[in-house]
Amino acid sequence: MINPIAALSPLDGRYAKSVEALRPIFSEYGLMRARVKVELNWLKVLAAEPKIVEVPAFSDFTLAEIDKVIETFSLEDAAAVKAIEATTNHDVKAIEYWLKERFSGVPEVAAASEFIHFACTSEDINNLSHALMLQEAREAVLLPKLAEIIEKLTGMAHELAAVPMMSRTHGQPATPSTLGKEIANVVYRLQRQFKNLQAQEFLGKINGAVGNYNAHMVAYPDVDWETHCRNFVEISLGLTFNPYTIQIEPHDYMAEFFQAISRVNTILVDFNRDVWGYISLGYFKQKVKAGEVGSSTMPHKVNPIDFENSEGNLGMANAVLGFLSEKLPISRWQRDLTDSTVLRNMGVGVGYTVLGFAAHLRGLNKLEPNPAALAADLDATWELLAEPIQTVMRRYGVANPYEKLKDLTRGKDGITPEVLKLFIESLEIPAEAKAKLLELTPALYVGKAEELAKRI
């Protein structure tokens, strides 16, 4: 293994430990492992088809041997495949030759060795392997890590549901909310995208060189190949069968999947920037870790580095995922090879996503609300009550309510409780309504924010 300090990519260097869970999935070893699984499961279903008499049904012993190779495929095995590829200059053919050699001592497989990779084009193996890799990454890494963020944010939304804060629209003071409600907004957005990721289909095909079962039909015209291949893709591999393809599976589902990940990333970039701003305003403080340095020259600094790191990595992820989404569904005629090298970078987009998730969660775990700063902002901005006052005036038929509050508050400095009190007392509205307005403060003017935050 290369020394991480000498790695070209930071994913395998500085950030290697943070993306360790992805390495067995998206590395070249991971691709080989998936190819072995596809090739051997294809051989198993050929042997189980009575009309393919040249491959008798495998015994339980042979099936167990096949499963053992699938489950124990190792780095040493991968190195042996690479050694074969040095001669073949073809990665999928190297897998086929390695399998023939590996099973030379298993009589039933050795007798049927020419049915390894039977009627397959390389892309039949590759497209299914890529689908398995993406599915594993979703189940083992992406969804659990996203669920962890959602769980953390949900807890924060509940905990901070009643902490009032001044909103800002266009960067200017606006109707109050609560910290918890603003976090709940993000939770809801992420929950929707989580469901989209869960529902994503992973498509596959094994229909030959141009998608028409040409070789299959010549060799065994009596086999219902479409049903056979559908069952293999859906039952043996747990994927979704694509019945209409060229040589390659068209990768539309990949574009959908990468775009779904990108939407999650975009939501987190948005929230990273908001939290960065709230820290700058003093609404949140950050827990200080002993020994850490915030600046090489300014000893006092406690910077929002986790949210900045998250934003940067998620931006990198979206750049890669965006290119994958745009490029992969495009292939000249029945295929060209431009997708092959691009597909080797799936793990890069997912890797930067995982880095962004991890940094965001680290940042969340350092946050502490600063009620004093929140309260001070609200108490200095009584003009926020212009909205409820003019709305109540509308209810009771007071003429030109909006315009009167605009004249009183817009662009004015030092709108005090006393100024608003005098204005309210001058209104010709029912005493009960007047009393409610006089009781109102910016910190109390939060509508259903607390309830909404606790309900998420």
Predicted regions and their residues:
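Long, amphipathic alpha-helical stalk/connector segments used for oligomerization, subunit docking
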Residues: 309, 313-400, 404
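Amphipathic, heptad-repeat alpha-helical segments used for oligomerization and assembly
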Residues: 240-261, 336, 340, 420-423
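Glycine-rich cofactor-pocket loops
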Residues: 158-180, 285-301, 332-341, 365-380
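Active-site-adjacent "gating/activation" loops or surface patches in catalytic cores
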Residues: 223-247, 251
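Generic, well-ordered alpha-helical scaffold segments in large soluble proteins
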Residues: 41-46, 98, 102, 137, ...
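Glycine-rich anion/phosphate-binding loop at the beta-strand->alpha-helix junction
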Residues: 193, 246-332
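Short amphipathic alpha-helical segments with heptad-repeat character
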Residues: 135-143, 147-150, 154, 184-187, ...
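A helix-coil-helix interface module used to build multimeric assemblies
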Residues: 1-216, 220-231, 294, 307-309, ...
